[in-house]
């Protein structure tokens, strides 16, 4: 209900150049060449919008001036929103490569200098060719990651 996710679309070459210093070496080339890059961020003051979206007048007090609680909530809920965003992109036929391999502090300084928004992850968006896709790395099995009580 808090809807803290914000997306900054980096379309122009100039915006990509601003992002370049924050990219890891392994993500540099593919990000600079992607048709569109989404910088998925979260609003640390998302609570300001709660009166419009949440039918409990006290909701704003749950997060205003609550420090780490507000930050963790914004990050967690924006990450959940980001997962659904990826599903939506794929549902309309787009290929997307989500990545966390970048320097968040550098990206924040370049795009969100006032500190209200904070970077979460990047998504390269476009129509892939299938070239250069490496086999998926092994994954932990269900038995290793889940249990029932």
Which ranges hold each PLM region?
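Short, well-ordered secondary-structure micro-motifs
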Residues: 18-20, 49-51, 133-136
């Amino acid at each position: 209900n808090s809807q803290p996710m914000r997306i900054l679309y980096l379309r122009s070459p100039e915006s990509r150049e601003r992002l370049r210093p924050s990219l890891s070496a392994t993500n540099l080339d593919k990000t600079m060449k992607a048709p569109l890059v989404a910088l998925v961020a979260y609003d640390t003051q998302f609570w300001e919008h709660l009166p419009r979206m949440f039918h409990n007048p006290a909701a704003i007090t749950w997060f205003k001036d609550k420090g780490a609680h507000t930050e963790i909530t914004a990050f967690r809920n924006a990450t959940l929103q980001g997962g659904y965003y990826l599903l939506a992109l794929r549902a309309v036929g787009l290929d997307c490569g989500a990545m966390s391999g970048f320097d968040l502090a550098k990206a924040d300084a370049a795009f969100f200098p006032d500190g209200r928004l904070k970077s979460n992850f990047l998504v390269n968006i476009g129509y892939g060719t299938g070239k250069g896709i490496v086999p998926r790395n092994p994954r932990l099995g269900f038995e290793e990651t889940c249990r029932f009580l």
